[in-house]
Each structure stands twice: as C-alpha cells, then as structure tokens.
Amino acid sequence: MKRTLLPILAASALALSGPLLSSCGFTPLYGSQTVTKGLGAIEVVAADGRAGYLVREQLDDALARDVNVLPSHRLVFTVKEMRYARGVRVDNVANRYELNMTVNWRLLDAKTGQQVRAGSANAVVTYDSADQPYAAIAAQQDGQERAATEAARKIQLDLAAWLAGRAA
C-alpha cells in the first residue's frame, strides 16, 4: 500500500507545483525563445593559445551558435592561466596543482562594434601530476579542459541572464 501511495503523492505534488510557480512570476531562463535565439546569434572569436581554443570550443557548444543566422553580437575574450603547486612530496616535488583560469570577455554589437556587455569568469580546478611525463601532461591538459568548460558555462549563464533581462 505504501509503495503505491508514494508515487501517486509525488506525481500530485509535481502537478500542483506548476500553477503555483507560474502564479508567482517564475519563468525558466530558457523558457523564452528570445534567450535561445539570442545565444545562437553570438559569434565567438577565439583567443590565442590552447586555452583560448578550448574556451571557444566550449562556448560554441554552450551557446549553440546557429551558422544559418547572421551574428548579432561578437564575443571576444582573453584567457589568463596561473598554476600553483598545492601538494608537495617529501623531496620537494609538486604532485598536485591548482589551475586558476580567468577569462575576461566583452560582447560587441556586430554592426557597430560597440561594447554592450563585459565580464569576467574565473574557474579553479586541481589535478594530480604523475611521475611519468605523458601522464603529467595528460593531467594538465585535462585540468585545462575542465577549467575551460567551467568558465564557458559561467559566461553562458551571464549572457543568458542578460538576454532574459532585455526580453522582459
């Protein structure tokens, strides 16, 4: 009896929560096509280096760039990386690192070139450094990829919130 009652109660609560949320003015960030289309119309210009390439790739995925639409905005950015030794062995060799990636970005109007929005996204990740050279390089590159993904996600959320505010 209890096993069949729990799913029914959960389904009822879920069904009742929709009207309650909409009556308080809640709308999902991506509930409007304005945000999705606005993000898809942003052209990302890659920064220099491997980190710049990784951030651009992640931003292209996150913004879902529509190549069939002329861009309304261009996103330009710079990437700064700092690496700190966090775990040190007895022989004074680092075996754990912290990677701090800062992405300073500017959103420009595609027609006028005027800056319409700017911001900064910071991502901090850690990774182990193995004794084997290949494993150490692979770990560092994985850390870069994770930091680029996190920074791109923060930029995407900032842009989506800005677009949603403009649509309201």
Report the location of each language-model feature:
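Bacterial Sec signal peptide processing site at the extreme N-terminus
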Residues: 17-42
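Sec-exported extracytoplasmic/periplasmic mature domains
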Residues: 60, 64, 152, 156-164
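Surface-exposed short loop/turn segments
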Residues: 66-72, 76-120, 125-142, 146, ...
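Short, solvent-exposed mixed-charge patches
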Residues: 166-168
